[in-house]
């Protein structure tokens, strides 16, 4: 028995060593405080960051199956593995992004102009304004949170001609905001992060921070950067609630 056991142990050890390493689940991607794009892996509340090798990002978004990154010279399109699959020349400055229901790139906004992805090209939409957040609203329309003076309005417009289809004042919304794929508006109210759906129903989670910006981190996730270059948070949006987690960052 001893001889058989001794002979068996090295075989077991070899079998264990031969097993492939288990990779943590992918959550999405964020840009860190230095502008480098980091893949976010792990589980809620226990995130690990991995450098994608992409730097100088001024805006970034990820849907779970595709990514969009704006640098001061280009707009980059990424696949699910964070590999660049297309690039477009672009002026300096930040951008807003939106994806379709399948997670494919749909819209981009920068320098006062709205663009749509169509047939592998980036085409301008006949609309201009001070957009705060954008989303696709059906196959032929876009939803935009527009700043008008000290008010924010939610506008739905035609992608074909740029005509406004309907609009409404976003009562109680004044700061940075985001739009989810279902049209819900995300904003800060006092100490809470709020998700308000089309019926006016709200989900809240305590945050206690001033927000610089929201960006899409992954499917069902938003990145939230605290004002003044502060901490980075991940907001998980569930049908019945919200969860907020701090994301560890690599020291610059």
What are these regions (language model features)?
Residues 25-32, 64-71, 103-109, 140-147, ...:
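Short beta-strand elements that form the blades of beta-propeller/WD-repeat-like
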């Amino acid at each position: 028995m001893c001889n058989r056991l001794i002979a068996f142990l090295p075989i077991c050890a070899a079998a264990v060593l031969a097993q492939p390493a288990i990779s943590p689940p992918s959550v999405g991607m964020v840009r860190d405080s230095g502008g480098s794009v980091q893949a976010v892996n792990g589980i809620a509340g226990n995130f690990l960051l991995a450098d994608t090798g992409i730097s100088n990002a001024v805006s970034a978004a990820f849907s779970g199956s595709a990514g969009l990154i704006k640098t001061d010279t280009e707009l980059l399109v990424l696949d699910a593995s964070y590999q660049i699959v297309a690039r477009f020349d672009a002026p300096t400055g930040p951008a807003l992004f939106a994806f379709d229901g399948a997670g494919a790139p749909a819209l981009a906004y920068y320098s006062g102009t709205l663009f749509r992805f169509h047939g592998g090209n980036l085409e301008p939409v006949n609309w201009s304004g001070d957009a705060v957040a954008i989303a696709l609203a059906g196959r032929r329309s876009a939803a935009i949170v527009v700043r008008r003076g000290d008010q924010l309005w939610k506008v739905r417009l035609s992608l074909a001609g740029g005509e406004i289809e309907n609009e409404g004042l976003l009562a109680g919304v004044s700061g940075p905001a985001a739009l989810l794929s279902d049209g819900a508006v995300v904003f800060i109210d006092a100490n809470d992060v709020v998700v308000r759906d089309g019926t006016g129903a709200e989900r809240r989670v305590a945050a206690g921070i001033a927000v610089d910006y929201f960006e899409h981190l992954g499917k069902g996730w938003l990145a939230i950067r605290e004002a003044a270059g502060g901490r980075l948070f991940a907001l998980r949006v569930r049908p019945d609630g919200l969860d907020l987690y701090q994301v560890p960052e690599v020291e610059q």
